[in-house]
């Protein structure tokens, strides 16, 4: 059975030492509210030039908190690409990453609107 959840997050990106070659690296910290309440921390690497419409990033973050009343941790994985200005995003829960009451949980996350204060709307399909 899949449950649809709604949440928002704000994100703080802090530049970190780049990966040799060309990839930029950032540490990220998110604060979640709604059906997901807690924090997540992780790392993002980026390549390309968004100004030209061609770029990409990968990110791994570990969420700690409560999801639909269940307490534990999960790891989220993101792959974002933009080719010719057309964005694509994959945002999933890493299989086997759950702890506590979130053991065995799988799912996908979809980012919706981002308001002027940086609040990201998220829909989560949790199985």
Describe the residue ranges of each PLM region.
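Targeting-peptide/extracellular-domain and disordered-appendage signature
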Residues: 1-127
